[in-house]
């Protein structure tokens, strides 16, 4: 009998567990269905948005009792992650609030919490979208206009804070201004005087703020034909135009207007007092930017008009397109399809808007959000999806860029070169070059012939020399790159007269016979220590002829491909290290690479990158070599600056890596100490898994890591000091010589060089910022020429 009872109990327990699993499974299915319904509401379907909303409200109202928290979370997530559907979700919340006032209050509290968390965690876009959502809830009679105005006023209070960065004050003003298109009309009708007071406070702030950073962020130095407006100035002009139009805009869909009779009966909630978190030194705010303009209505053919530069519709369209790129940039095909599927495409010249926004992203200063190739690949997909119109618009844009290239920012010039060469490589290198042949009459350093020359160099990397030669008209012969072959001087006709030729030939035979590094060292010993005709460095630290013979011979033998060169360097790594003991010796190695491969820019880039990775040459040696007299003829060529930037990036990555490792080690040490101190107090059931001895770093290890990081920081600072000091020297010398000779200093060479200085500041702004006070003290002093000093001051203003 007892056995029977036990069996019955087992069956009951099994049934209970099975039913519980079934309930959990059913609940999960319902939650997934609710999430799917909420996410897809308002998307294109057979029924209208309004009927979709009505049906969804009925479903959600029935499930509020069981799935309240889930629904709250999904809706607040949608508010932040799908800002393009803001008004759809605010209408949904408004209808739910009209039926269930308690739920409406809970949602407002949840949204306020999301907003405050976003501010606290420096999630600035999420905070702005949350604020927009709260503002649009005023239109749906969920939140009172008075309490929203109090929040907006509190945010504008930040503009009066002292001793905080301007970028902080700017962001809070921008967040308020960018919210007004959604709620401005309602505030104008209900609280006109309070709205005007808010706008007056904003105007006062905008009139007194510094715009020292503006010139550093411009794509073009000229304002013709389109002004290069600072982002807050542009948005303020758009808001003023909207105010002149009595806050009536034509872009934002407002489904809540259909339900006005229902929504106006609902009780409203008041927002609690929200105080923005105070500034902290660790906070990073969005940097300012310049609004990019390429087209106006005169550039577009017959069809819908392009909204004016100061119409709020232009801001709303551009923001929406930027968000589509942000959401889909990992999938170029999806991104292109979504851009072409823009909801209001029949009201605007969509292709022009898309092309302008993509180039705005590509030319964004100080750096684009994504890799250059991301934008190039999206444009290619757009051309494939819309072959009838988009290639023509893109060709028109390219023509505009080329004609305005004289005043283009140097960083943007590089990006334009990289994009155009990549684009040509995907369309059989076809272009109407004859239309640009007027540039052949200009000086070689002028941006137009320089652009074509650099494009052809990049095309060479994506094709081969004969193909480049065949695709270009004969008139462009002087701009076509040289055939990329090594210039091995020990095989030339004059080689017999060169010191080291005999040893070079011995080395060729030995390497082909697969000799060891030790055998190479023995062969090089035959070169006398006096080197070139008795010439030697004053400190006797290296033998230039040994380096010359070894580097040129080895790399010439490995010239068949990158892989052959890499294999040669790796095999004789020890010989390189022995020869490159000093910075002067490393510079000598770099000079020999240039002498051998001066006609093959890409080979130089990849070889120097390899030498840096193998720590054969130091970053400081590369920087010094770039500014050496031997490289004067190459100074305005893109590849040289590509080498400098990859060198700086390598140093930056090294510092970041050491910083991360030290931080992790300190965390482990701290956790191990706290774990051991807590272990005696914890009961056996509460005791956590202890950190093992193997996981715990010793204090000595941490100290060594700190020393490594300190040394890396010193090297990084030294690298930047070398680069900026050399810039100051050559620019100051040019300005002084021009003044002495009575010549205009504003030459093409000067513009390229000052542009490269600015590029180093902006491309590596996060790292350079750490040393700004040192740079100001040692290099960028008040007695420096104002042209050079302004570049530094503009850089500092970016984070001021």
Swiss-Prot record:
It is found in: Nucleus. The modification Phosphothreonine is found at residue 9. GO terms for biological process: 7-methylguanosine mRNA capping; mRNA export from nucleus; negative regulation of viral genome replication; nuclear-transcribed mRNA catabolic process, nonsense-mediated decay; primary miRNA processing; regulatory ncRNA-mediated post-transcriptional gene silencing; RNA splicing; siRNA processing. The keyword Nucleus applies. Transmembrane segments: none annotated. Pfam families: MIF4G, MIF4G_like, MIF4G_like_2. Keywords: mRNA capping, mRNA processing, mRNA splicing, Nucleus, Phosphoprotein, RNA-mediated gene silencing. GO terms for molecular function: mRNA binding; RNA cap binding. Residues 31-243 form the MIF4G domain. Its main location: nucleus. Residues 1-26, 669-699 are annotated as: Disordered. SUPFAM superfamilies: ARM repeat. GO terms for cellular component: nuclear cap binding complex; nucleus; postsynaptic cytosol; presynaptic cytosol. PANTHER family: CAP BINDING PROTEIN, NUCLEAR CAP-BINDING PROTEIN SUBUNIT 1. Belongs to the NCBP1 family. Component of the cap-binding complex (CBC), which binds cotranscriptionally to the 5'-cap of pre-mRNAs and is involved in various processes such as pre-mRNA splicing and RNA-mediated gene silencing (RNAi). The CBC complex is involved in miRNA-mediated RNA interference via its interaction with Ars2 and is required for primary microRNAs (miRNAs) processing. Also involved in innate immunity via the short interfering RNAs (siRNAs) processing machinery by restricting the viral RNA production. Component of the nuclear cap-binding complex (CBC), a heterodimer composed of Cbp80 and Cbp20 that interacts with m7GpppG-capped RNA. This is Nuclear cap-binding protein subunit 1. It comes from Drosophila willistoni (Fruit fly).
